[in-house]
Amino acid sequence: MWARCVNLAWGLLTSRMNLTRLKPCFDNLDGVFGIENSGHHKNSSNVLMLALGALGVVFGDIGTSPLYALKECFGHYGLAPTPENVIGILSLIFWTLVLAICIKYMAFVLRADNKGEGGILSLMALAVRSQQSKDVSRRRWTMTIIGLFGAALLYGDGIITPAISVLSAMEGLTLVAPQFSPYIIPLTIFVMNALFLMQKYGTARIGVIFGPILLIWFTVLGLLGIRGMAKNLHVFEALLPHHGIEFLMNNGMAGFLVLGSVFLVVTGGEALYADMGHFGKRPIRLAWFFVALPALVLNYFGQGALLLNNPEAVSNPFYMLAPKWALLPMVMLSTMATVIASQALITGVFSITRQAIQLGFCPRVNIIHTSSQEIGQIYIPIVNWSMFIGVIWLVLTFKTSSNLAAAYGIAVTGATMITTILAFEVARQKWKWSLLKSSAIFGSFLVMDLAFFGANVHKIPHGGWVPLVIGAIIYLLMTTWQKGRQILFRRLKERSMPIEDFCQKLLREPPLRAPGTAIYMAGDPWGVPAPLLHNMKHNKVLHQRVAILTIQTKEVPFVSKRDRISIQEVIPNIYRIIANYGFMEIPKMKHILEACRQRDINFNVNETTFVLGRETIIAEKGPNRPGEAGMAHWRERLFAIMSKNAQRPTAFFRIPPNQVIEVGIQVEI
């Protein structure tokens, strides 16, 4: 491994920036992290373009941390910017980047891809699907609960990151001219308003400039860092880990608590994994090791050198690192970089919401595709404006990036701990690692995560409660929806009958047949849906052709066309159809009918009637049924409200509304 690392470093130092010379470096990078150099993204020019795109999406959050991270290390703990403290904190920052990002995420977590996709819900689905222990159902339930809580915490992070990033960028105006101070908050709100208004138009057109802008940003970070380090080369002592250890030992509790601010340098780590499906592992690793990491280390060390020479610069070392003539351009570039970072996070929250809907943890909501080419380009109005309200509230309440830093970090540390736990399960169950190997590697990561989490706990009374409360609310909603749907499914199944029994009854007592085709949607592919039984009971008539359609979501991101549709003709002109989708896909009725047509089952859309059940949930007071794990009455009422306000299947599955019949069903839970 070390020989490959040396080859990689030598290739970087001796290669000129052309594709032919860089390709061996890419191959060495794959070898260091144990990746097969498969045909995926083999072309070097494609890898470079994807790496550039990854800069604009994946590294926005972690790339804007220099705006506030080092400043916050000295802001709340009574630590003076003495040479010993500066070198010690820089050492902690450097080794946090190495251990948390380079080793944990780049070398191990990125391996845990779910058919190429990443993210905490994708990892949860992979961990659940991989369970092979004796007590499978219990362990699957545990992994699901842990994963849901991790996803819920990321919603809290998604609201704080835009607020703290843009505020910290705008605060640079006070160095340009102190009279700008009263306008910081109004300008931040203006930028946020424009950002969230822009979402409905999508980012397909302007997204192409995100990568180049972030490349300029990282280049400027590196140049500013070199400028600062040139004035005091003693900062290179921070590369030695014993300085960080001595800092922790010499400063006691204050030294431990400063880890809460040190963690701010890696708050964008989850994005590396979440966006793996968009860019692939190689481009993300390439962008990190060749661009983002060097630029970040140079800038943090440059800020440290500035503090060694001028401790008074601790009030804003990032902007004071720049020459005075460059302050205004730096504020403008910082604002663009933080807007791009915020955009990436908003898109990430949209993606998590879509996955949660498909996996059955969230009610159906209106999802608008903003690009005909990119499946990931979506806009969810209710999520967008909920985030907007939350961000504006944070800006008006906390007012400065330093105040917001007190609320930042604890939710992300919780999510990173959960990622470690889920990755451990994948290593044990899917990769077949021994308990000793899995525990040694991921146990070490968990100790690191717990240290950061413990250092952030003290933030709870000072604003850290905000992301935790947001996460708790989202977690409550997701688990209530999941549990409520399970109870509803059981109630509907009680009213159903096996499709084989139903067909035998049709053969014995043939009903009147109406011309045309009827497609009944059902949650259970093996039972007859209540609307069909209702129709037979009251109307005693059946369409000439009847299909019972069930849409199932698998624990994989995408389902191949070959496995999309399963069709069985139970008896002549009575079909059972199962449409399989991944959690990254959104089912559409026209696509399902087209897949049926390719199987020689032609449903003419204009002559087809779609029959759906419309459940009215009645929250029943009293004890649960014997042997059934139900919900508290207030959660049953909450589920009833969520069900009532969920988007109707007609709109969600894009079914022609003038061909839909909805049959009302009252269900007590």
From Swiss-Prot:
It is a multi-pass membrane protein. Pfam families: K_trans, K_trans_C. The chain crosses the membrane at residues 47-67, 86-106, 144-164, 172-192, 206-226, 252-272, 288-308, 326-346, 378-398, 404-424, 435-455, 460-480. GO terms for molecular function: potassium ion transmembrane transporter activity; symporter activity. InterPro entries: K+_transporter, K_trans_C, K_trans_N, Kup. Keywords: Cell inner membrane, Cell membrane, Ion transport, Membrane, Potassium, Potassium transport, Symport, Transmembrane, Transmembrane helix, Transport. One of its GO terms (cellular component) is plasma membrane. It is found in: Cell inner membrane. It catalyses: K(+)(in) + H(+)(in) = K(+)(out) + H(+)(out). Transport of potassium into the cell. Likely operates as a K(+):H(+) symporter. Belongs to the HAK/KUP transporter (TC 2.A.72) family. This is Probable potassium transport system protein Kup. It comes from Bdellovibrio bacteriovorus (strain ATCC 15356 / DSM 50701 / NCIMB 9529 / HD100). The lineage of its organism: Bacteria, Pseudomonadati, Bdellovibrionota, Bdellovibrionia, Bdellovibrionales.
